[in-house]
């Protein structure tokens, strides 16, 4: 089976924060899991280097957009690597090959009549002497009345035209813009209404928020969307006479999944088409603000271009708040990953964002809960079980796994876990999958306690060997089951047990296997850091 996983492309206009990672992490877990099963996986993403957020930052800093985008692209790559993201290709939109792929799709759609030119009205700032694309404008949402940018409302999820905003103002100078005529290229999205409705009706793996929002758009009637902007930064429209126009960043970005796949193919020699056919298992992983671009825009572009892949699974996470408040990068109300990774283990971050993440509803990050989950679950449950078992072997068996008899009921339980957890992962019920594993970890600790090996090692040596041998097999299989979620600590424990690589099936470590140097898996985090971290944020 071929499995394609596309992770949303973060804007390269600032550092990655926990909100980004909360929505993107499911992609890495899926990729690691399917590889363990032996499936062929292509997992791609990249930095979105175009669009108004980067152009605006560049203007503020007096730099070129390319310098800003490249700075954060390089930082993103380092951050994702430190967090254990296992992309097969992490690329960027500021890439000549990507430009070629996007332009070729645009030409094909234009030739087929799915893209057309149209005179339209657009906001123009007389003071700045330029047209104002979407994010260059701020105003009142005509649907819900909140202050929003000119392309999309994050409050009611409406797609907006800048001219529809009330109390409009230019984000560069603050003045009120006027309306001028201009010409743009449009995607005939309305032509795909019936096909997109069928796609929605036949979905079997979209999250509820994706189904509800996409249904709303289709029932309200799909509107043709402008696919160009008056900018000097981005992918050029491939037609003469329109040199000042660039392709809308979200058309550009979602076609990045295709260009990243083709780029991967060029580097590896593997055919990209294997992951873009109708029978490919696909997962698109992103936040709920990106839903319409993945459930409506992307399928329309692919269908129009004659590409048969469909978004089978839409993994659209809800929002993450920080200490009970909405995350805001402009107010620096965020937890930035480059800073967090200096002080905390990547597996601690990964664990928290799955077990407490915004999988199906908004969730909250607090420093108190984060440190509690590390000390209570990773250290207190999992780390404790691994440490107490392996230290016992070092103390009483000279570091050699004893020749004991495996508890058959526990073996059956482990074998069942592979199927049960795998099924939940494939359905993207990741929180529940991890809960099931940690429930088993707690059962393993109870088993150790009830068997009392510290007593039987003196009074019933055979029973003690059976207990410890069984505990070793529990640990060995936990390294497999937890590998998609906690890759760093799983690798470390495999090193303790001399296990070569993970697998998604029951394994046993042989008696007399020599333990490598056993270390503490998760050091305790000082609770005083809760206050320090909250003060850094500015929490009273």
UniProtKB/Swiss-Prot annotation:
It comes from the Bacteria. One of its GO terms (cellular component) is cytosol. The keyword ATP-binding applies. PANTHER family: METHIONINE--TRNA LIGASE, METHIONINE--TRNA LIGASE, CYTOPLASMIC. Belongs to the class-I aminoacyl-tRNA synthetase family. MetG type 1 subfamily. Signal peptide: none annotated. It holds the Pfam family Anticodon_3. It is an enzyme of class 6 (ligase). NCBIfam families: metG (TIGR00398), PRK00133.1 (NF001100). Keywords: Aminoacyl-tRNA synthetase, ATP-binding, Cytoplasm, Ligase, Metal-binding, Nucleotide-binding, Protein biosynthesis, Zinc. GO terms for molecular function: ATP binding; metal ion binding; methionine-tRNA ligase activity. This is Methionine--tRNA ligase. Is required not only for elongation of protein synthesis but also for the initiation of all mRNA translation through initiator tRNA(fMet) aminoacylation. One of its GO terms (biological process) is methionyl-tRNA aminoacylation. Its cofactor is Zn(2+). A motif ('KMSKS' region) lies at residues 326-330. It catalyses: tRNA(Met) + L-methionine + ATP = L-methionyl-tRNA(Met) + AMP + diphosphate. InterPro entries: aa-tRNA-synth_I_CS, Anticodon_Met, Met-tRNA_ligase_1, Met-tRNA_synth, Methionyl/Leucyl_tRNA_Synth, MetRS_core, MetRS_Zn, Rossmann-like_a/b/a_fold. Monomer. A motif ('HIGH' region) lies at residues 10-20. It is found in: Cytoplasm. Its main location: cytoplasm. Zn(2+) binds at residues 141, 144, 153, 156.
């Amino acid at each position: 089976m071929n499995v394609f996983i596309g992770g949303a492309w973060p804007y390269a206009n600032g550092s990655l924060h926990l909100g980004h990672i909360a929505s993107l992490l499911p992609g890495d877990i899926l990729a690691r899991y399917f590889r363990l099963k032996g499936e062929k996986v292509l997992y791609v993403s990249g930095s979105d280097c175009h669009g108004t957020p980067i152009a605006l930052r560049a203007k503020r800093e007096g730099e070129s957009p390319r310098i800003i985008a490249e700075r954060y692209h390089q930082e993103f790559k380092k951050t994702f690597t430190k967090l254990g993201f296992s992309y097969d290709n992490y690329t960027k939109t500021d890439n000549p090959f990507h430009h070629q792929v996007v332009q070729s799709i645009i030409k094909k759609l234009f030739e087929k009549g799915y893209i057309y030119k149209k005179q339209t009205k657009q906001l123009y700032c007389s003071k700045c002497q330029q047209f104002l694309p979407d994010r260059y404008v701020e105003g009142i949402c005509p649907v819900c009345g909140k202050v929003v940018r000119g392309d999309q409302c994050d409050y009611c999820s409406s797609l907006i035209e800048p001219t529809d905003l009330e109390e409009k103002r230019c984000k560069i100078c603050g003045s009120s813009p006027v309306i001028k005529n201009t010409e743009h290229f449009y995607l005939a999205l309305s032509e795909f209404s019936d096909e997109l409705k069928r796609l929605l009706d036949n979905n079997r793996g979209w999250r509820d928020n994706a189904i509800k929002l996409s249904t709303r758009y289709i029932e309200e009637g799909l509107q043709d969307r402008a696919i160009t902007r008056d900018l000097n930064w981005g992918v050029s429209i491939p037609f003469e006479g329109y040199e000042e126009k660039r392709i809308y960043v979200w058309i550009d970005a979602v076609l990045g999944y295709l260009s990243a796949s083709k780029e991967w193919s060029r580097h590896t020699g593997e055919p990209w088409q294997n992951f873009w056919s109708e029978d490919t298992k696909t997962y698109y992983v992103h936040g709920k603000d990106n839903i319409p671009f993945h459930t409506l825009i992307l399928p329309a572009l692919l269908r129009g271009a004659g590409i048969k892949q469909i978004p089978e699974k839409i993994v659209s996470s809800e929002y993450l708040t920080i200490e009970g408040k909405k995350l805001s990068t402009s107010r620096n109300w965020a937890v930035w990953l480059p800073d967090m990774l200096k002080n905390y283990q990547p597996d601690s971050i990964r664990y928290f964002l799955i077990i407490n993440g915004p999988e199906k509803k908004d969730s909250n990050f607090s420093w108190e809960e984060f440190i509690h989950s590390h000390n209570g679950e990773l250290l207190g449950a999992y780390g404790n079980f691994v440490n107490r078992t392996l230290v016992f072997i070092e103390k009483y068996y000279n570091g050699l796994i004893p020749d004991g008899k495996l508890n058959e009921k526990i073996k059956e339980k482990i074998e069942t876990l592979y199927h049960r957890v795998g099924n939940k992962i494939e359905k993207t019920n990741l929180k529940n999958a991890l809960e099931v594993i940690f429930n088993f970890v707690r059962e393993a600790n109870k088993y150790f306690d009830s068997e009392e090996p510290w007593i039987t090692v003196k009074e019933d040596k055979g029973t003690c060997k059976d207990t410890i041998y069984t505990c070793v097999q529990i640990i060995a299989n936990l390294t497999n089951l937890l590998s998609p979620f906690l890759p760093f600590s799983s690798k470390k424990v495999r090193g303790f047990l001399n296990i070569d690589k993970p697998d998604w099936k029951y394994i046993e470590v042989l008696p007399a296997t020599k333990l490598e140097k056993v270390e503490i898996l998760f050091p305790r985090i000082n609770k005083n850091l809760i206050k320090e971290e909250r003060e850094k944020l500015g929490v009273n």
